[in-house]
Amino acid sequence: TLGYDGKGQYPVKSLKNLDSLDIDYSKGFILEKVVKLKKEISIIITRFSDQKYEIYEPIENVHENQILKYSKIPAEINDKILRQSKLWATQIAEELKYVGTLCVEFFIDRNDNLYVNEIAPRVHNSGHLTINAYNISQFENHVRAVCQLEQISLERIADAKMINVIGDQITIYRNKKFENNEFFFDYLKKEIKSKR
């Protein structure tokens, strides 16, 4: 359950300093290579039971202190990354034989190498902007897939940027007046937590 937003992660410059870290080794751990990150993107894909797909365009995610700051579409990536990320997301959904909406997050390094960072078999926070950017949101597509409803071709109807409102910032947004092309979605969490 750790590993998101930088939780449970420790930078290790040498294997010699593993003993100095506050890690419960009985629970196991993973050592990962540090990627010289250029950017992160998400591919949201919906796989239907007839093995057909609807794939949203790549979404670019920008983080601050390892927490999502905002997501935007279209992502600023080259055609090679566009094709490869969509292909890999499709292959992952197919190998899992997954029905529904799935997110595959990718890291892009400074040499334009692509790495799978996360596979989330569900609707995903980076895809919430599909509500206003597409004719069919990730949520509706998920329901369509799992309930075997008609598949409708995706059409992007607007560029979009989604700001991740965390902690007590929520009170500012709850009282803000929004322009015609701005939308606010409040999950009405009972407890406001710092950095969540």
What are these regions (language model features)?
Residues 59-62, 119-123:
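Short beta->alpha transition motifs characteristic of CBS
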Residues 28-32, 102-103, 152-153, 195-196:
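A short linear hydrophobic-aromatic micro-motif
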Residues 1-95:
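Active-site nucleotide/adenylate-binding loops and adjacent lid/helix of ATP-dependent enzymes
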Residues 54, 102, 114-118:
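Protein kinase-like catalytic core scaffold
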Residues 157-159, 165-196:
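Glycine-rich active-site loop/lid that clamps phosphate-bearing ligands
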Residues 83-104, 120-169:
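Active-site "cap" helix and flanking loop/linker of ATP-utilizing ligase/carboxylase catalytic domains
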